[in-house]
Amino acid sequence: ESGSVQEGTLCFTLSNVDPYEFSLIGNVHTNRTNSPIHSIYGNPKYPLVKDKHMNDKLIGPGFLGFNAGHVTVDSTDPASLTEAMMKGRKLARQLHEGLVEFEPKSFGASFLASTANLMGIRESRRIKCDYTFTLEDWLARKEFEDGIGRNCYYIDVHKQDATVYPRYKKGESHGIPFSCLTPAGLKNVMVAGRCISTDSYAHGSLRGMPP
């Protein structure tokens, strides 16, 4: 609504992670109280690490994928995208160096295997449809006569000043109406995916993709 969008992320992979040592810690996710990201963030050696966002997934033996770090980017601006891609690669290297420093048993012999070909964009243009799903709808667990799906994902907004809302309890969900996929004033047209008609906070939930 204001033109301010969520942060982007350039995903990356590490290879030659020690399988045994990594099995002892399980992951380096932000939620782990002794995750190395808590030492990396704020360390002057890693100035591009501006928050503690870190998700990791074991892809294969010694091969780890990361959705980690944030880069400010406007995906409608080619220059901004280019700058974000360059900064994202530098950020991936800094995160790897931090993992080597603070979790050397697992990452000491690892190397940066790849960075994504495209910037991960969480929020960009959305299409104005016959109905706009809002934060209030999410909070109310609203049902719709034209519901075509259900969602229970939390409000996951990647902004440092974002308001945090309580997650749904087990078994709770809301409906997703067909009318937030049909562009206003058009016929025989349907939109789906990130451009779904929502407000910014509701988008933080509906944008989510299962792993």
What do the PLM-derived regions correspond to, one by one?
Residues E1-M209:
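Flavin (FAD/FMN)-binding glycine-rich loop and adjacent Rossmann-like elements that form
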